[in-house]
Amino acid sequence: MQAYFVLSSVCSNFALMIYPSNFENKIQFSEIRSLLKGYCLSQLGKDKVDAMGFTDNAERINTALKQTREFRRMQEETDDFPLQFFFDMRESIKRIRIEGTHLEENEIFDLRRSLETVAGIVRFLNRSDDDGNFDYPTLHDLTEGVLTFPDLIRRIDQILDKYGKIKDTASPRLAEIRSQLRKAEGSVSRTLYSILHAAQSEGLVDKDVTPTLRDGRLVVPIAPAMKRRIKGMVHDESSTGKTVFVEPTEVVEANNRIRELEADRRREIIVILTEFTKLVRPHVDDIVNAYRMLAEVDFIRARAEFAQLTGGIEPEVSAKPVVDWITAKHPLLWLPPGKAGKTHPCSASAMSR
């Protein structure tokens, strides 16, 4: 029978003495870590790879092997396991423990999608047969104590659109501000085009010129020699000096109003983000716990992919000091052609004396 090394190292809560101290380097374990991290979907899994170490706890090793075995079986049996949106939101979530802080728009979007993944994984791993036997019992254990957050997801959907941007309807105040802003911008645009067309008719401005933005204000590009022909304020000039950007007097006040409305919009968005964050704050510990599950799933998936890559089989592990390897090979030597060197099979057998 041929046996292969298979990755079964798990994080240990105690320091296991390894001799020699550079044992990992000698067996090129850093390369295994690198390969594993390449299979991770997020920093969540990569941190687990970095943290893993050797252990002599047979129960932990066998649990890790069962997890890998079940994940490989799942990959063969189904393709609907949730693997999208493994976002690492741990630092963002921990940050909002402090009163007065708030999540940003993009953070809420990533939170929504990753919480959806958490809920999907919990649903998937809770599948069972008619007798109540879970399809993947060891993986199911990962969901114990993991909460899902349908109310938070629903609230996010009320705030953000499908692109992760704040909706007009996120609050009545925001809807009103954005409505006023659109009207003000439309009015400025119409006035500018009217001034521009008149200037083009008089030959002051080229026919292909259109209004542009400078420092958040709509302006008209014009040749320096003609700038006094249009009453207004010069805001900028091009790097070549051949164009200046004039804000006509007729739109200065309207542009000021636009800036005020933009400031109002930002303040209202901060109110919305702050109010939502208040809903999240009581659940910080439970959300962080959910991300621990995502990290474990990411790590297990990486192990399953590595086992597939190297053709690994599941070894038998007992708590007894027994080593019985038959034609064993280092897993790196089972990489596809071109990725590995010459194989050096070995056999070893040792029993406690």
Regions found by a protein language model. Name each.
Residues 32, 207, 216, 220-237, ...:
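Gly/Lys-enriched N-terminal cap/neck module of very large, oligomeric protein machines
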Residues 220-221, 289-353:
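Conserved NTPase motor "head" modules and their coupling/switch loops across ABC/AAA+ ATPases, GTPases
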Residues 6, 10-173, 177, 283-286, ...:
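Conserved amphipathic alpha-helical "coupling/scaffold" segments
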Residues 176-226:
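Extended, Lys/Arg-enriched charged tracts that mediate electrostatic binding to polyanionic substrates
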Residues 148-164, 253-274:
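Extended, charged coiled-coil "arm/hinge" scaffolds of SMC/Rad50-like chromosome-maintenance ATPases
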Residues 2-4:
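Low-complexity, intrinsically disordered or signal/transmembrane-proximal segments
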Residues 262-296:
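Non-transmembrane, heptad-repeat alpha-helical coiled-coil rod segments
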Residues 97-104, 126-131, 193-209, 302-313, ...:
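Active-site phosphate-binding and catalytic loops of NTP-dependent enzymes
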